[in-house]
Regions:
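Extended, low-complexity cationic-aromatic segments
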Residues: 1-77
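Short, well-ordered coil/turn elements that cap or connect secondary structure elements
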Residues: 3, 87, 111-115
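C-terminal anion-handling pockets and recognition modules
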Residues: 5-8, 131-179
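Mobile genetic element proteins and their domesticated derivatives, centered on retroelements
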Residues: 12, 49, 76, 95, ...
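Acidic/histidine-rich, metal-coordinating catalytic segments
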Residues: 12, 87-101, 124, 129
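RNase H-like polynucleotidyl transferase catalytic core
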Residues: 33-41, 110-130, 147
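Short, basic/hydrophobic alpha-helical segments
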Residues: 71-91
C-alpha cells in the first residue's frame, strides 16, 4: 500500500568517465574488424541523482569538484524544495557514504525532521538502491561503444538523457519500481 503523504526518493552519486566503455555489439559480416576509438584518459564528471519512486521524476546536480558534506547538503535541500511544494514528507534512501552522516547537515535534518528524513541502506549493498539501475541504463544509452574527444561531449550526452527524465517518467518509475 502506498502512503500518499510521503515522497520516497532513491539517491546516489555517480561518475561517468570520458573513456566510455566497450561492449559486445553486432556488426554486418561483410564489415572488416571495426576500430573503436578510445580516449586514453581517466577524466570524469560526477553527478548527484535522485528518482522519486512514486512517479519516476528524476533530479540531478553536476558536481564540479568532488562529493562532500556541503555538496550533499545542497542536493538534499533541493530535493526537499521539490517535494515540499506538494505537501508531502520527503524520505531519501541513500548509501552510507561518510558525508551522508556529516555534522554539517545534522542540525538541519533535526530541525526539518517532520518533513525530511534520510534512510540508510545496509553497508556494501548498492544492489538495493533502485537508482543504480538508472546509472546502468544511462551508461548503456549514452556511453557504450562511443568515442568522446573531450569531457564536454560526455556531459552533453549524459545531460541530454537526464533532461528527458526530469518530469514524471514511466520508464524510470518502472525501472525503479518497489511496489
Amino acid at each position: 500500500m502506498q502512503d500518499e503523504t510521503v515522497d520516497l526518493w532513491a539517491t546516489d552519486e555517480v561518475h561517468f568517465q570520458q573513456h566510455g566503455s566497450r561492449c559486445q555489439m553486432w556488426i554486418p559480416p561483410e564489415t572488416k574488424d571495426p576500430v573503436l576509438r578510445h580516449a586514453p584518459t581517466r577524466r570524469s564528471v560526477g553527478y548527484f541523482g535522485a528518482v522519486r519512486l512514486r512517479d519516476g521524476r528524476f533530479q540531478f546536480c553536476r558536481e564540479a569538484d568532488k562529493f562532500n558534506g556541503a555538496t550533499f547538503f545542497a542536493f538534499m535541500k533541493s530535493l526537499r524544495r521539490t517535494s515540499i511544494r506538494t505537501g508531502r514528507r520527503v524520505v531519501v534512501i541513500t548509501d552510507n557514504a561518510r558525508y551522508h552522516h556529516a555534522r554539517l547537515h545534522k542540525e538541519w535534518r533535526e530541525v526539518h525532521a517532520e518533513d525530511f528524513a534520510l534512510d540508510y541502506l545496509p553497508p556494501y549493498s548498492p544492489e538495493l538502491n533502485p537508482i543504480e539501475r538508472v546509472w546502468k541504463l544511462t551508461r548503456r544509452r549514452c556511453l557504450h561503444n562511443r568515442y568522446f574527444p573531450d569531457l564536454d561531449n560526455v556531459i552533453a550526452a549524459v545531460e541530454a538523457e537526464f533532461d528527458q527524465w526530469t518530469n514524471r517518467n514511466e520508464t524510470l518509475r518502472r525501472l525503479c519500481a518497489i511496489t
